[in-house]
Structures are given as C-alpha cells and as structure tokens.
Amino acid sequence: GISGLALGIFLKENNFPCVIYERSSKISEYGAGISISPNGKDVLEKLNILEELKAISGNSKKTIFYSNLKEITSIDTDVLTTSRKNLYDLLLKKYSSLGGEILFGYELNDVDIGEKQIYFANGISHNVGHIAACDGIKSKCRQICFTSEMPEYSGYSVWRSILDQKQSNISFHLGPGFHIVSYPISKNKTSFVAAIKTKQKNEESWMLRGTYSDLSKDIPVEILNDYEALKNTQDIYKWGIYTRPKIKSLYSNHLTLFGDAAHPITPFIGQGGCMALEDVYEFSKILKSNDSQFLKTQKEYQSKRLKRIRFINKASMNQGKLNHINNPLLVFFRNFIMKNTNIVSLMTRKIWEYRA
C-alpha cells in the first residue's frame, strides 16, 4: 500500500537495505479515489513524485458545500485528487528505480517479533533486522502482536465508484444521515463517495459490489441525478468503515506499525493517505538521525505521532457527526455558521498546516 512503498523509498534513499513483501500477485486498486491535502503533498514532494502525479490527476482549487441541493458556502483549496492506482504506480516506479526489491505472492502467516523471523503462507521464512507493518486495517502483524485490539465497526458504511464524468471542483452534499463527496481524479473521471450512518455492518473491503438500486435506497435520487454516470456503471462498491480502540502504542519489540495498520480512521476529513505518508517520513527521518538505532527511533516516532493521530481521529469522527445531522434546527445552525463564518477554513488549515 501507500505506507509500504513510501517507506521503502525513504529507506532506499537513505541507504537502508529493505525488501517489501506483498500478499497480492500484483498491486491493484479498484473503484478508489484519494485526496491529498497540503500536509500529504509535502511528503509527496520529498518523494519527488508530486509534479508527475499532479500531471495525471485532478487538482481542485475550490470546495463547494451543499445542503438540500442548495449551496451553503465554498472555500479555496489546494488539494490533489487522484486515483489510488495512479499513486501506487508512481510509488512503485520510484521504489523500483532505486533498486528496491518487492516480492509478490508473499502472504504473511506468522511473525516472531523477538527473533525477527517472518513466516509466509508459501512456506518461505526470512530473518530480518526490523519489521515495518504496513498491511492495512486487517493487519496480520497487528493481530499477532496486539491480540486484544481488533477492528470495530464505526457505525458508518460507504458507497463509492469512479465515474466517467467531468468535474472541476470538490463537492460536498450534506444530508440527514448521509453525505456525499465527489472530486475529479483526472480530466474525464470523477470519484464518488457516499457515506451513510447505519447499524448494519458491512465488510471492510474494496471489492464488495453494490448496485445503483441499493444506493438509491440510501441516498436521495434528487442528488444522485447530479451523477448520471452512476446509472451506467457496474463498478459500484460498498464497504463498512472500521476503526480500532484508542491507539496506545505504535510498536512492539522489533515491529513498528504504519498507516491503517497503526491507526485506521474514518474518512470524513480525507486524511487516511496523508497520515500514512506522514508516518513513514517521520519514521525514516528519525531513523536516519539515530544512526539506525531502531528502539530509540520507535520511541521518538511514537512520541511525535500519537498526539497527531488522536487529534485527526477525533476531528474525523466529529466531522462525520456534523455532516449527518438530522435535527432541522441543528441543520439550520450548522449551515448558518458555515455560511457566515470562516470556521471551515480555520478547521482545514489546522489539519493541513502540519508538516512531518
């Protein structure tokens, strides 16, 4: 994923030997867009892939907020909106250009963090110097090393698709019990995401297919009519949003956690990918300054990241609640404050100004 490839690049650039083990037979991402705000773009610039990614992505300069199909307010933004596949492809290209090794078809079976031994489902095992767990929300590494912390359903599920439809700005539709965000990921394609508040759990998966008919039961057709391409695609997916209990540690013995393996968050402020990028840059920077002393690096990494992680997690959960307000009076006050104050710009600035 994002964190593994980005970490590999930073390690190779600093002459740290590393190898990436990938469960899948190839890197792929279906039906998924990603937004990268200035804090994440700063890391992409350090990876030397920002300009190349911008050239094939959407580069939205404005975000518009709607309620009941009426515009509430808009803000200027400097957000890179693209597909995960585009980002993955460039990260892989960069990592490979540095002589980086990646082994596909290596599904993790077990790990001994005391002996630093990794065991794979294909029968192969390797002894390593340190283990970087970048294996996502269903992290096998985390299950083995942090057995009491299992993913928990957040109460939200999300519909998403990539549409053959042009769009220049980022759009938010706020509604009772749901919200929609859409943004351009290239000149001719748009990412569509609709989040709903529901007690019905859905599997956390990129590949759980849904239908337009089911989507229209969760989201008003009047809003879906703005996205005509939804009616003509079979690539509509639905997945549940899962988080973990309050994060207390980012490492255990000779293993360190990154990205969703460390701190899966709800997607309501678009910081999942950015947080993964911040994680790996911070870790690699500290590792270099500590002359490869991993334990010292782990402690400093955790000290620097935990406060940020908890702030973003709380901000994202609160944003989800604001987006999905049902009470008409509270909706009125929310919209009034958004329209007549600079609260939206202030909140985004607080998140985006951070630099790892």
Residue ranges and their predicted role:
Residues 138-139, 158-160, 178-181, 262-263:
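Histidine-centered metal-chelating micro-motifs
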Residues 2-13, 19-21, 132-133, 235-324:
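Conserved mid-domain beta->alpha element of the FAD-binding
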Residues 335-356:
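C-terminal auxiliary extensions adjacent to catalytic cores
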Residues 37-164, 199, 206-215:
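Conserved N-terminal helical subregion
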Residues 9, 16-17, 49, 100:
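Short phosphate-binding/catalytic loops that engage adenosine nucleotides
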Residues 73-92, 126, 164-238:
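Conserved FAD/dinucleotide-binding core of flavoprotein oxidoreductases
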Residues 3, 26, 138:
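Conserved Rossmann-like nucleotide-cofactor binding loop
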Residues 19, 101, 191-193:
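A structural signal for isolated positions on well-ordered beta-strands in alpha/beta enzyme cores
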